[in-house]
Structure formats: structure tokens, C-alpha cells
From Swiss-Prot:
The gene is NPF2.11. SUPFAM superfamilies: MFS general substrate transporter. This is Protein NRT1/ PTR FAMILY 2.11. PANTHER family: OLIGOPEPTIDE TRANSPORTER-RELATED. GO terms for cellular component: plasma membrane; plasmodesma. It is found in: Cell membrane. The keyword RNA-binding does not apply. One of its GO terms (molecular function) is glucosinolate:proton symporter activity. Keywords: Cell membrane, Membrane, Transmembrane, Transmembrane helix, Transport.
Length: 616
């Protein structure tokens, strides 16, 4: 039968077969018409509400990053923790935040919706920043400062002090875990996804989102870190707490203007249904011409785009095979979703399953970023950080700003130079595909670690063979190598982020079903969480394996006695293998394609005939 375009109204001469069989109940066409009518009632204010959303995003990122960016130094300088202990805490904390995004996404999409989730999250972030501020401002909440002499007593924190600190970090886990998966999707909710201006607005919002993110990191890693390191920890932590309070005010000021999409129920239940039914029906023969003969149904007000059939993971197709035992409701809906699923449900599950191998490779990629956000700080502490002849010393944590600068600058170069150039070559509107963008980022990440290894080898050689610049507190001799040599590795990591991070976020957003976009945001951060825990595991394993070896501990407290360069080369090797794996998975992957413009008449007709045959 010839496929015909979807119409908003049915006529007497061209009636939906399901309407004839089921007595004129709600059909797919009626559902679309009702959906369009309901959509007109929604007032999309688009850019008019962006001052509230982007303003909240900016101050929220300034607050969180201002609190966390120098936390590594804070734990060693104020809480008197050893470097490896502090690095392990930071990795575990970052991983917990990232895994927390998955829980928040589930609660958001299932029960509360994005607005309510964000409301709780921004308040939790403020409380977390305030508690961390108190650990610095109240002397009883942190241990006494260590003496400057090498043999001076240096007491660690008490159990109560650690507990209070962890309470503040716990609030930040709740806050950041709720904000990260929901903020981007909530901003995109304010644009009409069906209009051309709305689609352009969503694309532009992605750029603004990452611009504010990098802007906040740059400002936090320069101004806020400088105040914390050179003026006062109390004042330096007051700034992000105040900014988080402003973020709360700005967010709630736009309360009556936002488009607030209600939670649509657990999408995880639909995934479980497809898997369970496919297992139950595993003995059935695969359907012939499955794009025609698999059962399909679109409920009223269905938000997701209608997906074309794909022939990957065909064992899942059996969940949508209609048998004589399967019962349908009068409107065509399965009577028991745990016995019969729709082809649409199956294709949505396929979308998620296809993403997982790509997500795994992207998670390994983040090993680069987690290491480039921690150990370069320790490298800078034992390098020459003087700027010019005026005696100004750049705070060690500030050097990470070059990662953000590299990312920010290259985003502009990518958008204004590379995309137009590649568009002429490939004919694609985006210049290159999303997977090509992610793969390029993984390549640059590997290169940044190789460069980091050579730079650390040079820094260590200078420290061991040339006059040094004194002793770093609780570390070792300060190498005469300028800390500016850290810029190449950090800039390459920034370029990697411009390719891979933005590419991943857009990839997940577009490849996940529409009712799982909070999950799409969370899976991006869960990947970062996996890499954080993997980074902690690698640090602990390398430390334990090498501390008693003849070559010495690679990750010694004094970097001059360690071999951080070999650690960098080891991770570069892991990423090289991961890059090869990603290339294989990219060739296998199939992008999600919608079939919204195709009528369901032919499919419905085949389904009815199939059921009648089964009943007979």
C-alpha cells in the first residue's frame, strides 16, 4: 500500500482502519490534532525568560565553581590533608555529584518535573556553599594551621570537623546533582520545538549555556581563587555563597513566566516492559516486514517523535509482535503493557541501547579532564609561578583557567571558521557529525596527556639538576621551570572539551527520546562520575603498586621524588585504546530518525489484519 502523508482530519473517503474496527475511538490522527490544539495553549516566551534562566545559570555556576575550584588547595592548606587524600576526596565527591544526576533525573522526569527539581536544587546549593563558608570562618570548624618548619606539628581535622565539612559537600551533591541534568533541558523547554525560530533558539541556547559555564569557571579560577589564596579563605568563600543566593533570587523571579512541563511518569518502566516482554516472547519467530507488521500505537498527547523502524537489536522486536493472547483496549492501547509493547516503545529502547557503547567511550575520555583538573595544580605548586618582575605569584589553582580559555576560544573558532569550512566540504549543516566531533575531542584529549607527560618530565629534571626556588609547603623543592609550560597541555584539554563535551551533550539530547531529556543530561554527568571513580581507583592502585618499588612511588607527595610523567603516559595509553574502540563503535552506530510525517494507516491496517488472523 502506498504511504500517504499524515493528515490532521480524517474524511469519509479515507478513514483510519482502527476507527472502523474500534467504533470510532481516538485514533492516531485525532491524537495529533488534539496535541496541536493543546500546544497552542502553551505560551513559549523563548528569549524573554532567558535573563532569568541564564542569569541563574551564571550565578549558580559562579557559586558552585567558586566553592569547588580551589577545594583541593583548601583541603590541604586549611584541613591539613595529604595531597593524595585530598585528590581522592575530590574525585569521589565529583563522582558522587555526577552519579547523583541520574537519581535527580529519575525524580524529575517521573514525579516532580524540571521546575520543582531545580527549585530544591538551587536552595541546596546555597546551603552547601554557606556550610563550606562556615568551615573557614569559624575556627572551631577546621584544624589549627600547621607551622612553617619541616618538623612542626601538623594536626589533621577532628571527626566533627570532617562531618561538618561533609555535610556541606552533601548539600552541594544534592544541589549540583539536581541542577546539572535539568537546567539545560529546562532552558530548552522555553522554546517552541515545532517552529523554526524555536529550533534556532534551542541551538543558540546550547552555545549560551556553555559560554556561561566557561565564563563562570574562568572568573572563579582567577578572581575568586586569588581572593581565597592571597586575601582570605573566609572572604573567598563568602563570594560564591552570596552568588548562590543571587542565583536563587533570579531563578524564582521568573516563576510566573516559565513553561513548566509536568512529569510524564517513569520512562524506565517502558524500558523494563520492552525487555520483559521480549524475554517472554523470545520463542516467537521474527516478524516479516517488521516495519509494517509490528504492533504500534500512539497515545493521545504523545510527546515523543515517531521513530522509523531499525533492524538492530531485532530480539527486542518480539515485544511488539501481536499474538492471539494479547488484548487491546477499545482505543487500540494494549490492555496489559507487560504482555505487549508498541514498535515505538521498542525503537525508543533501541535508541538508548545504541547510545551506551558511545557513552562508555566518552566516560573513559573524561579521565583526561579529571586528571588535568587536579595534578596540574600540584605541578604548579612546585613550579615557578612568578609573573614578571613585580613579584606577583599566580595561585596554583588558577592555571586550570587555561583549560577553560582554550575551550572558550576554540568554541568561537569552531563555530565561525571550522563549521563553515567543513560544511562546504561535507555538505552537512553542522560541518561534521556529532560522533566525528566527539572522536576529535578524544584524540585531542590523548594528545594533551602525552604533552603533560613531557612537561612534567622537564619540570622534574629542572628541579633535580638546576637551582631551585625554595620549598613548597609540605611538598618539596620548587622547580625553576616556569609554570607557563603547563599551558599547552591545559589548552589541548580545553580544545578536547570544545569538541567532545559539547558534542556529547548535544548528542545525548538529540538521540534520547524526548521524555527522557533529563536522563540525557544526567548520562553526560554520570560518564564524568564513572571517570572520577576510575581516576580514584587508578590513583590508589598506582600509589599502592609503586610505593615500595625500586623506581619509587610515581605519585609521591613531593612530585620531584615521584614519576607523575609516567602516570600521564599510562593514562594516555588507556585513552589511545579507547579512541580505537570509539572509532569501531562510531561506524556501527545509527542516528535516531523520526517518522512523524508518515501515516500510521498502513501499519494499523496490517496490525488489524494480523490480529484478526490470529483470533481466527
Amino acid at each position: 500500500m502506498e504511504r500517504k502523508p499524515l493528515e490532521l482530519e480524517s474524511t469519509d473517503n479515507h478513514q483510519n482502519p482502527s476507527s472502523a474496527v474500534y467504533g470510532g475511538s481516538v485514533t492516531a490522527v485525532d491524537s495529533v490534532e488534539e496535541d496541536v490544539q493543546n500546544q497552542k495553549k502553551v505560551v513559549y516566551r523563548g528569549w524573554k525568560v532567558m535573563p532569568f534562566i541564564i542569569g541563574n545559570e551564571t550565578f549558580e555556576k559562579l557559586g558552585i565553581i567558586g566553592t569547588l575550584s580551589n577545594l583541593l588547595v583548601y583541603l590541604t592548606a586549611v584541613f591539613n590533608l595529604k595531597s593524595i587524600t585530598a585528590a581522592t576526596i575530590i574525585n569521589a565527591f565529583s563522582g558522587t555529584i555526577n552519579f547523583g544526576t541520574f537519581v535527580a533525573a529519575f525524580l524529575c522526569d517521573t514525579y516532580f518535573g524540571r521546575y520543582k527539581t531545580l527549585s530544591v536544587a538551587v536552595i541546596a546549593c546555597f546551603l552547601g556553599s554557606f556550610v563550606i563558608l562556615l568551615t573557614a570562618a569559624v575556627p572551631q570548624l577546621h584544624p589549627a594551621a600547621c607551622g612553617t618548619a619541616a618538623d612542626s606539628i601538623c594536626n589533621g581535622p577532628s571527626g566533627g570537623q570532617i562531618a561538618f565539612l561533609l555535610m556541606g559537600l552533601g548539600f552541594l551533591v544534592v544541589g549540583a546533582g539536581g541542577i546539572r541534568p535539568c537546567n539545560l533541558a529546562f532552558g530548552a523547554d522555553q522554546f517552541n520545538p515545532k517552529s523554526e525560530s524555536g529550533k534556532r533558539g534551542i541551538d543558540s541556547f546550547f552555545n549560551w549555556y556553555f559560554f556561561t559555564f566557561t565564563f563562570a569557571q574562568i572568573l572563579s579560577l582567577t578572581l575568586v581563587v586569588y581572593v581565597q589564596s592571597n586575601v582570605s579563605w573566609t572572604i573567598g568563600l563568602t563570594i560564591p555563597a552570596v552568588l548562590m543566593f543571587l542565583a536563587c533570587l533570579i531563578f524564582f523571579a521568573g516563576d510566573k513566566l516559565y513553561v513548566k512541563i509536568k512529569a510524564s511518569g517513569s520512562p524506565l518502566a517502558g524500558i523494563a516492559q520492552v525487555i520483559a516482554v521480549a524475554i517472554k516472547k523470545r520463542g516467537l519467530k521474527p516478524a516479516k516486514q517488521p516495519w509494517l507488521n509490528l504492533y504500534n500505537y500512539y497515545p493521545p498527547k504523545y510527546a515523543n517523535s515517531k521513530l522509523k523502524y531499525t533492524d538492530q537489536f531485532r530480539f527486542l522486536d518480539k515485544a511488539a509482535i501481536l499474538t492471539p493472547e494479547d488484548k487491546l483496549q477499545p482505543d487500540g492501547k494494549p490492555a496489559d503493557p507487560w504482555k505487549l509493547c508498541t514498535m515505538q516503545q521498542v525503537e525508543e529502547v533501541k535508541c538508548i541501547v545504541r547510545v551506551l557503547p558511545i557513552w562508555f567511550a566518552s566516560s573513559i575520555y573524561y579521565l583526561t579532564i579529571t586528571q588535568q583538573m587536579t595534578y596540574p595544580v600540584f605541578q604548579a605548586l612546585q613550579s615557578d609561578r612568578r609573573l614578571g618582575s613585580g613579584g606577583f605569584v599566580i595561585p596554583a589553582a588558577t592555571y586550570v583557567v587555561f583549560l577553560m580559555t582554550g575551550m572558550t576560544v576554540f568554541i568561537v573558532v569552531y563555530d565561525r571558521v571550522l563549521v563553515p569550512t567543513m560544511r562546504r566540504i561535507t555538505g552537512l549543516d553542522t560541518g561534521i557529525t556529532l560522533l566525528q566531533r566527539i572522536g576529535t575531542g578524544i584524540f585531542f584529549a590523548t594528545a594533551s596527556l602525552v604533552v603533560a607527560g613531557f612537561v612534567e618530565e622537564r619540570r622534574r629534571t629542572f628541579a633535580l639538576t638546576k637551582p631551585t626556588l625554595g620549598m613548597a609547603p609540605r611538598k618539596g623543592e620548587i622547580s625553576s621551570m616556569s609554570a607557563m609550560w603547563l599551558i599547552p597541555q591545559l589548552s589541548l584539554a580545553g580544545v578536547a572539551e570544545a569538541f567532545a563535551a559539547i558534542g556529547q551533550m548535544e548528542f545525548y539530547y538529540k538521540q534520547f527520546p524526548e521524555n527522557m531529556r533529563s536522563f540525557a543530561g544526567s548520562i553526560f554527568y554520570v560518564g564524568g562520575g564513572v571517570s572520577s571513580y576510575l581516576g580514584s581507583f587508578l590513583i590508589a592502585t598506582v600509589h599502592r603498586t609503586t610505593q615500595n618499588s625500586s623506581g619509587g612511588n610515581w605519585l609521591a607527595e613531593d612530585l620531584n621524588k615521584g614519576r607523575l610523567d609516567l602516570f600521564y603516559f599510562m593514562i594516555a595509553g588507556i585513552l589511545a585504546v579507547n579512541f580505537a574502540y570509539f572509532l569501531v563503535m562510531s561506524r556501527w552506530y545509527r542516528y535516531k530518525g523520526s517518522d512523524d510525517e508518515v501515516t500510521t494507516y498502513e501499519t494499523n491496517e496490517n496490525i488489524i489484519k494480523q490480529q484478526d488472523k490470529n483470533v481466527a
